[in-house]
């Protein structure tokens, strides 16, 4: 049984629910954590204490998505060059 035949057998309400779950899951695990990584990298040295508190709260909230991308993103400092 191919994928198209499987989709045609499901009721339309079920497809809407699956699409909604996929959108929420994609937002929670992919979109927001990547945007948060970009924001942290851009503003790391210029954040106020309240902005930093808010960012840390968002990191706590979106921790599962942050863990998904942690092995692939390197935000360490560049260092002093050749020593």
From Swiss-Prot:
It catalyses: a plastoquinone + NADH + (n+1) H(+)(in) = a plastoquinol + NAD(+) + n H(+)(out); a plastoquinone + NADPH + (n+1) H(+)(in) = a plastoquinol + NADP(+) + n H(+)(out). GO terms for cellular component: plasma membrane-derived thylakoid membrane. Its main location: membrane. The keyword Hydrolase does not apply. It is found in: Cellular thylakoid membrane. The keyword Oxidoreductase does not apply. Its EC number is 7.1.1.-. Signal peptide: none annotated. Keywords: Membrane, NAD, NADP, Plastoquinone, Quinone, Thylakoid, Translocase, Transmembrane, Transmembrane helix, Transport. Pfam families: NdhL. It is a multi-pass membrane protein. One of its GO terms (molecular function) is quinone binding. Belongs to the complex I NdhL subunit family. NDH-1 can be composed of about 15 different subunits; different subcomplexes with different compositions have been identified which probably have different functions. NDH-1 shuttles electrons from an unknown electron donor, via FMN and iron-sulfur (Fe-S) centers, to quinones in the respiratory and/or the photosynthetic chain. The immediate electron acceptor for the enzyme in this species is believed to be plastoquinone. Couples the redox reaction to proton translocation, and thus conserves the redox energy in a proton gradient. Cyanobacterial NDH-1 also plays a role in inorganic carbon-concentration. This is NAD(P)H-quinone oxidoreductase subunit L. It comes from Synechococcus sp. (strain CC9902). The lineage of its organism: Bacteria, Bacillati, Cyanobacteriota, Cyanophyceae, Synechococcales.
């Amino acid at each position: 049984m191919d994928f198209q035949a499987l989709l045609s057998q499901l009721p339309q309400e079920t497809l809407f629910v699956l699409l909604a779950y996929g959108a929420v899951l994609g937002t929670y695990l992919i979109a927001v954590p990547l945007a948060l990584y970009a924001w942290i990298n851009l503003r790391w040295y210029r954040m106020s204490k309240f902005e930093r508190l808010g960012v840390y709260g968002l990191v706590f909230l979106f921790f599962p998505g942050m863990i998904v991308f942690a092995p692939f993103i390197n935000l360490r400092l560049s260092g002093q060059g050749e020593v």
